[in-house]
């Protein structure tokens, strides 16, 4: 890596430490939620042009019909665009995106990037709730700005707890993952925990810089409180059902217990996945 490239990365990381992350995200959130026709049309057009958004696969193909940028960003897809693998033993991708990392949880640590990892206990935010996932399996899926931003169930289960964990709002791209220790266990997140026929399963929705919010079907849109909030539920969700959505991009991490599943060998870091695609299978 050249000196210039290293310097750019260092400045990018330092800038994130200096920027008032939550205040910036709140400002962006207000713009994203605005229903002012001129403002929302301008923002949607700029975003659509920059990221090459394909609205032909969206349920609503007319960008002017969305009531706000948030409405556009969390757009639904047409029926049949994403097919959920129906094999009973399939573990499917919870989202459209790219795999950041995938594999085993070793010594209670989840691999983040070269030279970086974090504890599953810190990720979950509660030692007792994290215990079943020690030495288990994980997959981290990064949703880029151009992706479909709803998160779905990787396997059928009963939602038993949601745990809001306050935190920072670093960017979650590859540069940050390689340079910010414990990134996903430091950022604000919503932990969703399930009982399944395989035992415990977790889906963690991780926030990021300028992410205007996280929403789940059980809690609605999360209102940051600055403190850990545990809620109990008993909500059955089938594989492929919508679990939540991001208002601007971020990351979903799925966790399973030890010796319950195996990932398909073709998947590795940077592999592209789509929601409903088979990523693994039960043992």
From Swiss-Prot:
* InterPro entries linked: PS_Dcarbxylase, PSD-B, PSD_type1_pro
Report which reactions are catalysed by this protein: a 1,2-diacyl-sn-glycero-3-phospho-L-serine + H(+) = a 1,2-diacyl-sn-glycero-3-phosphoethanolamine + CO2
Q: Which cofactor does it need?
A: pyruvate
Enzyme Commission code(s) on record: 4.1.1.65
Q: Which residues form the active site?
A: 96 (charge relay system), 152 (charge relay system), 250 (charge relay system), 250 (schiff-base intermediate with substrate)
Can you quote the record's cofactor note? Binds 1 pyruvoyl group covalently per subunit.
- What pathway does the annotation place this protein in? Phospholipid metabolism; phosphatidylethanolamine biosynthesis; phosphatidylethanolamine from CDP-diacylglycerol: step 2/2
Biological processes, Gene Ontology terms: phosphatidylethanolamine biosynthetic process
How does the record describe its quaternary structure? Heterodimer of a large membrane-associated beta subunit and a small pyruvoyl-containing alpha subunit.
Q: Which residues carry this modification: Pyruvic acid (Ser)?
A: 250
Look up the coiled coil feature and give its residue ranges: none
Gene Ontology, cellular component aspect? plasma membrane
The way this protein sits in the membrane is described as:
Peripheral membrane protein
Q: Which family does it belong to?
A: Belongs to the phosphatidylserine decarboxylase family. PSD-B subfamily. Prokaryotic type I sub-subfamily.
* Subcellular location per the Swiss-Prot or TrEMBL entry: Cell membrane
Q: List the disulfide bonds.
A: none
Question: What function is annotated for this protein?
Answer: Catalyzes the formation of phosphatidylethanolamine (PtdEtn) from phosphatidylserine (PtdSer).
Q: Provide the site residues for: Cleavage (non-hydrolytic).
A: 249-250
Summarize the PTM comment: Is synthesized initially as an inactive proenzyme. Formation of the active enzyme involves a self-maturation process in which the active site pyruvoyl group is generated from an internal serine residue via an autocatalytic post-translational modification. Two non-identical subunits are generated from the proenzyme in this reaction, and the pyruvate is formed at the N-terminus of the alpha chain, which is derived from the carboxyl end of the proenzyme.
Protein name (record): Phosphatidylserine decarboxylase proenzyme
Keywords linked to the UniProt accession: Cell membrane, Decarboxylase, Lipid biosynthesis, Lipid metabolism, Lyase, Membrane, Phospholipid biosynthesis, Phospholipid metabolism, Pyruvate, Zymogen
Name the Gene Ontology molecular function terms of this record: phosphatidylserine decarboxylase activity
């Amino acid at each position: 890596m050249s000196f210039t490239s290293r310097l750019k990365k260092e400045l990018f990381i330092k800038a994130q430490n200096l920027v008032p992350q939550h205040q910036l995200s709140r400002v962006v959130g207000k713009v994203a939620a605005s229903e002012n026709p001129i403002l929302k049309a301008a923002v949607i057009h700029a975003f659509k042009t920059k990221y090459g958004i394909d609205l032909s696969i969206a349920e609503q193909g007319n960008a002017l019909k969305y009531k706000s940028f948030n409405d556009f960003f969390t757009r639904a897809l047409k029926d049949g665009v994403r097919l959920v693998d129906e094999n009973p033993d399939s573990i499917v991708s919870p989202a459209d995106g790219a795999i950041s990392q995938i594999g085993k949880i070793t010594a209670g640590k989840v691999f983040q990037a070269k030279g970086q990892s974090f504890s599953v206990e810190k990720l979950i935010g509660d030692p007792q709730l994290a215990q079943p996932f020690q030495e288990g399996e994980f997959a981290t899926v990064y949703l880029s700005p151009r992706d479909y931003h709803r998160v779905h169930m990787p396997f059928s289960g009963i939602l038993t707890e949601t745990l809001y964990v306050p935190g920072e709002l670093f960017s979650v791209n590859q540069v940050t993952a390689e340079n910010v220790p414990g990134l996903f266990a430091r950022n604000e997140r919503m932990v969703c925990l399930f009982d399944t026929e395989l035992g415990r399963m977790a889906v963690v929705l991780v926030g990021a810089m300028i992410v205007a919010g996280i929403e789940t079907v059980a809690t609605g849109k999360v209102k940051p409180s600055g403190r850990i909030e545990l809620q109990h539920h008993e909500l059955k969700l089938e594989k492929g059902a919508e679990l939540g959505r991001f208002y601007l991009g971020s990351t979903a991490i799925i966790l399973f217990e030890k010796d319950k599943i195996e990932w398909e060998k073709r998947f590795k870091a940077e592999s592209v996945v789509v929601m409903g695609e088979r990523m693994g299978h039960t043992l």
